[in-house]
Amino acid sequence: MTIPDLCNDLVDEILCRVPARNLKRLRSTSKRWNRLFKDDRRFAREHMHKAPKEYLPLMLTSEYRICPVSINLQGDVPSVVLKRELSLPDPDYSHQFDIGRVFHCDGLLVCNHVGKNPRYGSKIVVWNPLTGQTRWIEAGYRWKEYEVRFVLGYCYQQDENNSCSKKIYKILCFYPNGQDTEIYELNYSDRWTRTIPDGDLTPGWTLIYSEQTVSMNGNLYLFASEKSKPHLGVSLLRFDFSTEKSSLCVTLPYQRPRYEILSISAVRGGENLSLLLQLDFESKTEIWVTNKIDDTTTKGAAVSWTKVLAFDLSPDLQLFSEEVNFLLDEDKKVAVCCERWLEPQEHHRYQCRREYKITDKIYILGEDNKVDEVGSGEGEATDSLEGISQVILNYAPSLVQIEQAGGGKTKRGDD
């Protein structure tokens, strides 16, 4: 018996257990399968729950492009290779969209351009790189500034018959000070709303390291310190997209008012958080992972951390700054760390602004203070400090559908 001889329900049940990237290769097998993978929301939901998770490291380069990353940790000499950039055509212009910032949640990327070029207006895009689906959103000219953050999360809502829960995706837009916060709901609205009281993202708290945010189980985690008790140090706050409030407080392994380096990432399929930190005035750098976060209370989370890596690096190496990003391989006890260096160039009298040479550096750090520099690339000189932060993230390919405003069909880019 071959697959065409099986009933459709059984075929769908089998395909629900095939990794998403493999399904993309099967789209040309039949018209029915193509429609199933592209347009069937029920199948996409089933696939999300039943298919094995896979991860594809992606990097935002100094050329404002998203590139898949091949990481080889086998053998004595590890390597990191950037592959061909992913295509994201600008719908209004005959060129690729320049990505200044990117945030990942649930197989979707939310990207925005940074800079003052008026041709871009203030568009942002929600993008599924696997399927090519996009939704372009007008964010308003007040959100053109580089400092603004666009992040993505979700909550669940019962359908009209209370028979099943539907994921509701929302974009949160905020400034580094946590003010002027607005929310855009992808499923139902086509406008930004300030549902958060007074537009304050973290009432009673001060945002710290606002570049460092991560999504876990649809919620947003970000660093903050309590205004009335700054001596208690930096904690993690959880923004819950169902209540649209910041509430849950997660203590860090050390209670310090500030750190030399503090970076956050998601591990274990987005079910746990990992933390790269270096205490103030110390050379020792550590990576910790949460074992469990008890989020049944809004007063504060019961959390346990496990230290998985520790390095005591020479200060002469100067590997990290506050802008470092990292991915952790728990099994191999290895971290891939990326950051972007800006070297001021000679400033001539006729130049209005100083130029900087951009250099991207990638390191692999293992046990016993082993450091391998496996990637280094120079970008074009720039006279702007906008969009300088390099980002590496663990993208989880999925078939999740992006709903258009008014319930229209999803737009697709190049496959």
Swiss-Prot record:
Q: Look up the further comments and give them.
A: Double knock-down mutants of ETP1 and ETP2 show an accumulation of EIN2 protein and a constitutive ethylene response.
Full protein name: F-box protein ETP1
Q: Which CDD domains match?
A: F-box_AtFBW1-like
Quaternary state and interactors? Interacts with EIN2 (via C-terminus).
User: What is the annotated role of this protein in its UniProt record?
Assistant: Negative regulator of EIN2 protein stability.
A Pfam family annotated for this UniProt entry: F-box
What is its induction? Ethylene treatment has no effect on RNA, but down-regulates the protein levels.
Q: Where is the signal peptide?
A: none
Knockout-associated phenotype: Slight ethylene hypersensitivity.
F-box domain: which residues? 1-46
SUPFAM superfamilies named among the record's database cross-references: F-box domain, Galactose oxidase, central domain
Species this chain originates from: Arabidopsis thaliana (Mouse-ear cress)
